[in-house]
Design a protein with these regions (language model features):
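Hydrophobic h-region of N-terminal signal peptides that target proteins for export
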Residues: 9-17
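Sec-dependent signal peptide recognition
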Residues: 2-8
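Sequence signature of WD/YWTD-type beta-propeller architectures
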Residues: 19-336
Length: 336
């Protein structure tokens, strides 16, 4: 999820009757349960047995076993760890995202953001992949394929307002490193700032977000074989950030502000909840999944879907915080 200035996250509420003053965690439906009481940016293991997450922004990566509910710290052997994301590879190993050290929030999230490899073997330490990148990454569940975006902050060869999507393979035959890097799409200006999200259709296609001016965004997809790009959300003037994809590749989870049509409030990445979008290119099949934004200051974000489609992990968040900040991981059961 992209980091967005707090100005765009502020909530301009309509009269208080529009949103409840209660705590959304006290009104969870029967298919949602609290998994942890801290943490953010969850990622489900390929075998659906564990959920990795960040303890906090610029902090340690953790993993929780879904049966025992035992939490293990993955990076506590790294002094002053300042990672921002943890994601599973298909091998069960991990990709970490974040800076080498903390300078300040802006510089460390942008210029210094890079990819790391972490073995699943206990006691392993992160290994730099030598790749600066922007925001999050797409990680294949079926291969060692990775995709990420870059802006001029990480790639000085880009024009100041340009961004690009790069697909690469992770080579684990020796010291982990990226090979076969290929730019698959480029935006020339701020009308669309890119962020990779998920592979689907046997890694032949990929979803990504197009961040637009004035705090808006669109759900996009690219056919990696033909280069054809599709706007799946087709809702100009609104916020639609693509998140975890469903295993059938027909639907994706989306952070969206569509509920503001009924609830009021400033549109953008502050007033969001989780929606389900059919990737048929019409932008019409949107279903709301969570209702945290029905409550003053509440939102839910950063959803990921299990590979069997049975559940979703996401986080409880606050409208006034920066994007990605969370206060605990929850599970949403589609089918127990």
């Amino acid at each position: 999820m992209r980091s967005t200035p707090l100005l765009l996250l502020s909530c301009l509420m309509l009269p208080l009757g529009q949103r409840s003053s209660d705590d959304p965690l006290q009104h969870l439906p029967s298919n949602i349960e609290v998994l942890t009481h801290f943490g953010e940016r969850a990622d489900i293991s390929p075998d659906n047995q564990r959920v990795a997450f960040m303890a906090k922004s610029f902090g340690d990566a953790m993993v929780i076993d879904l049966k025992s509910r035992v939490i293990q710290c993955l990076t506590c052997n790294v002094p002053a760890a300042v990672f921002l994301r943890v994601m599973h590879l298909g091998t069960g190993d991990y990709i970490l995202i974040g800076p080498d050290h903390f300078e300040n929030t802006h510089t460390s999230r942008t210029r210094d953001n890079e990819l790391w490899y972490l073995s699943k073997e206990r006691g392993s330490k992160p290994i730099k992949l030598g790749q600066k990148m922007s925001e999050g990454a797409a990680i294949s569940k079926k291969s060692l394929k990775i995709a990420f975006s870059q802006t001029a902050a990480q790639a000085p060869d880009l024009a100041p307002e340009a961004s690009r999507l790069i697909v690469a393979d992770l080579d684990l035959s020796g010291t982990p490193h990226l090979i076969n890097k290929k730019t698959v799409y480029e935006s020339k200006d701020r009308s669309c700032t890119l962020e990779a999200q998920d592979f689907y259709d046997d890694d032949r296609k990929m979803t990504f977000t197009c961040y637009e001016p004035e705090g808006r965004s669109s759900v996009m997809g690219i056919d990696l074989q033909t280069g054809e790009v599709t706007n799946f959300s087709k809702a100009p003037g609104t916020y639609n950030e693509v998140e975890g994809i469903f295993p059938d590749g027909l639907y994706t989870a989306v952070e969206a502000d569509r509920q503001c049509e009924q609830l009021g409030g400033q549109r953008g990445s502050g007033n969001i909840d989780i929606w389900k979008l059919r990737l048929d290119g019409t932008g019409k099949d949107f279903t709301r999944l969570t209702h945290f934004n029905d409550y003053e200051g509440g939102k839910s974000s950063n959803p990921v879907i299990s590979t069997d489609g049975r559940f979703m992990a996401f986080q409880s968040a606050r409208t006034t915080d920066a994007a990605g900040v969370g206060y605990g991981i929850l599970l949403y059961w589609f089918n127990r």
